[in-house]
C-alpha cells in the first residue's frame, strides 16, 4: 500500500502511563513506538552514574573484556573505535537489577509481543555510547535470519528491543533511523518511497520499542563533542532454550570436563555462522569460560558425586 502524498508518517509517541493495549496496537501497525519517560529522572541519573566509570575506563584505552585474548568472532573486535559498550549490567548496576528488569510497562508489552511463544527473557543488556565521528551503520534487522528461526511478516516475534536514550537523541548526533513499515516486507526496501526513513529523536529517559523485523541503523554522530548514549534492552522468547539447566553443577565437576563438553552444557560460549558470525552466550563480549577463568580437563574425584 502506497503512502499518500503529503502524509509523511511519524513514529507514534506515548507516555509511560498510557494504556498498554493502545501502545501495543501502534507497535504492531508500525513496528516501532516511542515511550516517553520510560526511565524516571532519578533512575536515569543513578544508572548513568553507575555506568560512567566503566565507559571512562574504556575511553582511556582499556578493553571491556577482562582477558587479553578475545574469542574469534567477538563483537568487540567489530566495533568502530568511537563506539564503546558496557555489558554485564546486572553484575554492577542496582538500577538495572531492581528497576529496569522489573519495569512494569516493559513486561506488559513483552507479554503481548510473545503471547504466541510463552515466556521471554533478556537476550542482551548493554550500554552503547557513540562518540563524535561514530560512522553510520548499515541497514539491518536485529532478528537473525537463519532458516530454523526465520520469521517474516505476519509471524511471531523473535526479538524486541527497548532502545532507551540515556542522553538526548538528535539527528545530528546519530539518532536511530528506521525504514517505516519494513517489518511487514521481506528484504531491505532501501530507497522505496513507501518505506521512508524516520528518525527517533528523543529526550533522555525515553525509549524506542522496535520489532526485531524492523530495518534500522544508527546514524552518523556528526558532532564534535557529544557522546550519544543508549541502553539496548533486547528481549527474546525462550522457545529454543535447552530443556535442562546445568547451572547447578559444581565448578570442580565442570572443570573436569573438556571445553567441548562444557559448551554442551552451556558453560562455554557458542558461535554462529555468517552473516552475523559473532559469539553467543558471552560475557563482556568474550568467551564466557575465559572471562570466568574456567579450567578444563582437571582431576576430579568421581567418588564424591
From Swiss-Prot:
How does biotechnology exploit this protein, per its UniProt record?
Hancockiamide D displays potent cytotoxic activity against murine myeloma NS-1 cells, suggesting a potential antitumour application. More interestingly, hancockiamide C, the likely end metabolite of the hkm pathway, shows potent Arabidopsis thaliana seed anti-germination activity, but is inactive against the monocot Eragrostis tef seed, suggesting that it could be a herbicidal lead targeting monocots. The herbicidal activity of hancockiamide C could be due to its phenylpropanoid-like structural features, which may act on the plant lignan pathways, and hence warrants further investigations.
Q: Which InterPro entries match?
A: Phytyl_CoA_dOase-like
The record ties this protein, via SUPFAM superfamilies, to: Clavaminate synthase-like
Picking any one GO biological process from the record gives: biosynthetic process
Binding residues for Fe cation:
140, 142, 216
Record keywords, A-Z = Dioxygenase, Iron, Metal-binding, Oxidoreductase
Give the Enzyme Commission number: 1.14.11.-
Cofactor(s) annotated in UniProt? Fe cation
Q: Name one GO molecular function term.
A: dioxygenase activity
Q: In which pathway does it act?
A: Secondary metabolite biosynthesis
State the family named in the UniProt similarity comment for this chain.
Answer: Belongs to the PhyH family.
- Tell me the function of this protein: Dioxygenase; part of the gene cluster that mediates the biosynthesis of hancockiamides, an unusual new family of N-cinnamoylated piperazines. The NRPS hkm10 and the NmrA-like reductase hkm9 are proposed to convert two molecules of L-Phe to the intermediary piperazine called xenocockiamide A. Xenocockiamide A is then converted to hancockiamide D via a series of hydroxylations and O-methylations.
| Name recorded for this polypeptide | Dioxygenase hkm4
Q: Organism, per UniProt?
A: Aspergillus hancockii
Amino acid at each position: 500500500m502506497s503512502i499518500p502524498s503529503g502524509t509523511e508518517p511519524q513514529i507514534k509517541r506515548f507516555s509511560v502511563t498510557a494504556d498498554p493495549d493502545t501502545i501495543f496496537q501502534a507497535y504492531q501497525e508500525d513496528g516501532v513506538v516511542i515511550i516517553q519517560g520510560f526511565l524516571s529522572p532519578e533512575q536515569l541519573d543513578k544508572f548513568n552514574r553507575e555506568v560512567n566509570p566503566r565507559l571512562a575506563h574504556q575511553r582511556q584505552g582499556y578493553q571491556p573484556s577482562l582477558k587479553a585474548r578475545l574469542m574469534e568472532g567477538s563483537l568487540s573486535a567489530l566495533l568502530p573505535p568511537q563506539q564503546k559498550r558496557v555489558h554485564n549490567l546486572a553484575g554492577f548496576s542496582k538500577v538495572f537489577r531492581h528497576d529496569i528488569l522489573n519495569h512494569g510497562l516493559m513486561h506488559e508489552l513483552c507479554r503481548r509481543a510473545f503471547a504466541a511463544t510463552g515466556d521471554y527473557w533478556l537476550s542482551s543488556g548493554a550500554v552503547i555510547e557513540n562518540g563524535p565521528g561514530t560512522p553510520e551503520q548499515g541497514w539491518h534487522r536485529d532478528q537473525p535470519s537463519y532458516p530454523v528461526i526465520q520469521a517474516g511478516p505476519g509471524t511471531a516475534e523473535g526479538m524486541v528491543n527497548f532502545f532507551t536514550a540515556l542522553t538526548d537523541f538528535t539527528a545530528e548526533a546519530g539518532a536511530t533511523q528506521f525504514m517505516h513499515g519494513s517489518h511487514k516486507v521481506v528484504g531491505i526496501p532501501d530507497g522505496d518511497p513507501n518505506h521512508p526513513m524516520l528518525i527517533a529523536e528523543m529526550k533522555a529517559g525515553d525509549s524506542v520499542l522496535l520489532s526485531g523485523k524492523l530495518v534500522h541503523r544508527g546514524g552518523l554522530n556528526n558532532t564534535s563533542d557529544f557522546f550519544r548514549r543508549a541502553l539496548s534492552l533486547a528481549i527474546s522468547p525462550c522457545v529454543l532454550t535447552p530443556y535442562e539447566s546445568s547451572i547447578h553443577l559444581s565448578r570442580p565437576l565442570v572443570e573436569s570436563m573438556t571445553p567441548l563438553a562444557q559448551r554442551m552444557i552451556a558453560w562455554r560460549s557458542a558461535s554462529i555462522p555468517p552473516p552475523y558470525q559473532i559469539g553467543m552466550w558471552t560475557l563482556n563480549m568474550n568467551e564466557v569460560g575465559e572471562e570466568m577463568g574456567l579450567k578444563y580437563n582437571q582431576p576430579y574425584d568421581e567418588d564424591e558425586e
